[in-house]
Amino acid sequence: MTFPILILAAPTGAGKTSLITELDPTRFEILSFDSRQIYREMPIGTAAPTKEQQSKIRHHLVEVLSPKESIDAGLYNRMAEEALQKVLNTDKIPVFTAGTGFYLKAFLFGMFPVPEISVSVRERVLSMSIEEKKVLLNDLDPEALDKIFSGDDYRLGRALEVNLMGEKWSRLKIDPNTSAIYKYNLEIRLGIFLDLDRKELYERINLRAKRMIDLGMADEAWEIRERYGESCPGLKSLGYNFALENKKGNSNVETFLVDLSQSHRNYAKRQITWFRKENYIQAMDRSEALERIKHIK
């Protein structure tokens, strides 16, 4: 027996959350693959679904970790597997929503058998800029650097961690036994990439950034800093560095808006690059996506 699943991927600001709330809650439940929205206490800067939106359809893996906790593909896999089992037991169809494509792909198709990373190595890599990571990775494993998209800070960091633990990241092979598709006999009935005109997407992102600032993202960031420290993993999420700089008085609100908008546009560009090369999803607009989902059995 196979279990049908849906995949809904989209760049930040594309309207994925609002589309989700239009789905039939008696037929579907959401498994979120988003490395930012998994954190609690940070709803403004992560644009997490509101309580009202979550009440319309069951969400899993949203606002479940403390900002002081680290997240990686291995932990995400374990949490996602627990959530998937719950959904399959309801006879509903799981909808995998993705902003973080790497986590989704690792869960569905399998993970690399990476060594356990020591605290000292993880802290060292976290303290490095993306350019510093590239330089060191080029020295240790140039083949790995060639395989990783230059703007993918997460994968650069993970590859560097593996190499610093004494193994070549470029020589690792995916273990198919860790694939959820294989383990749970899943069938991708429909894979959607929510496609927007680039100009429209950037306008939406700019408006979202302004709304985040108006709602108090700087205060939210400062409260997290006071509670868990400035180096806590949650504050590594997109845009919080600019929020803290604003709160410290090192930038005005105009600069904050420019920097926040630009960082979100750059992130969206990287997401689009990632998802466009994945063959298990196809680009379509919102209306077509909703119509196709309605007819899934």
UniProtKB/Swiss-Prot annotation:
Q: Does the keyword tRNA processing apply?
A: yes
- List the signal peptide residues: none
Query: So what does this thing catalyse?
Result: adenosine(37) in tRNA + dimethylallyl diphosphate = N(6)-dimethylallyladenosine(37) in tRNA + diphosphate
Report the InterPro entries cross-referenced here. Answer: Dimethylallyltransferase (IPR039657), IPT (IPR018022), P-loop_NTPase (IPR027417)
The alphabetized UniProt keywords are: ATP-binding, Magnesium, Nucleotide-binding, Transferase, tRNA processing
- The residues that hold ATP are 10-17
| The keyword Iron is assigned to this record | no
UniProt EC number: 2.5.1.75
Q: Which GO terms describe its biological process?
A: tRNA modification
Provide the residue span(s) of the region labelled Interaction with substrate tRNA.
34-37
Residues the record marks as site: Interaction with substrate tRNA: 100
Q: Which GO terms describe its molecular function?
A: ATP binding; tRNA dimethylallyltransferase activity
* Broad class of enzyme this protein falls into: transferase
User: Which cofactor(s) are needed, names only?
Assistant: Mg(2+)
Q: Which Gene3D superfamilies match?
A: Crystal structure of tRNA isopentenylpyrophosphate transferase (bh2366) domain (1.10.287.890), P-loop containing nucleotide triphosphate hydrolases (3.40.50.300)
* Residues annotated for substrate binding in this entry: 12-17
Pfam families, alphabetically? Answer: IPPT
Q: Which domain of life is it from?
A: Bacteria
| Oligomeric form and interacting partners | Monomer.
Q: Which HAMAP family match?
A: IPP_trans
The text of the family note is:
Belongs to the IPP transferase family.
Q: What does this protein do?
A: Catalyzes the transfer of a dimethylallyl group onto the adenine at position 37 in tRNAs that read codons beginning with uridine, leading to the formation of N6-(dimethylallyl)adenosine (i(6)A).
Give the protein name, as stated in the record. tRNA dimethylallyltransferase
Q: What is the lineage of its organism?
A: Bacteria, Pseudomonadati, Spirochaetota, Spirochaetia, Leptospirales
